[in-house]
Amino acid sequence: LNPQNYDGIILARETLHEKNMQRRVVERLRESGVPVISVGAKTEGMGCIEFDDYHAMSQMVRHVICEHGARKLAYIDGPKEYSDAAKRAQAYKDVLEEEGVPFDSHWFFKGDYSVEAGTYVVSELDRMHRIPEAIICANDCMAAGAIMELQDRGYRVPEDVLVTGFDNVSIAKDNSPRITTVDCDRETMGYRACEYLMTKTAK
């Protein structure tokens, strides 16, 4: 990719999973002088459009606790390389503390945003005889996997176990039952990114 071939660039930084690759791409874009806007993650020296993952996950966790009365909440985290995953996980921990729900490390699982991560966590919870009242997932794919595995093991969703996702991608709508999720409104973010670049590149 030669940045000079473009009038402007939208950088979805966290689609570059490897940190060194992120660093090299960001440095090259900065040096190019081409207008760049980062979507989803703050990047020094660039404009940024960022979704408030922390606030949205806080609302989701608080809803599960306060509206549904759940006190035993498992959490499936996203990859450590993703800043959005870190914000979502911190929101889960903070809301538990604020609502007087003890944090239990045995209900906090590392995931990788895949369907398989959701199925694995449920199989582990069932093996330990620790199926919770709710499973909060850092994205929709893991939520879909969790629901599928729960159903395979005879649990009803949401009657026996609540499961929530995040991102509102197509799998959330296509799943049965539909996944309760957070809409990150990526269409609006993309529109605003284009607007920003158009103002920067206008002659």
Where are the regions a protein language model picked out?
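Bacterial carbohydrate/catabolite-sensing allosteric modules
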Residues: N2-G8, T15-K203
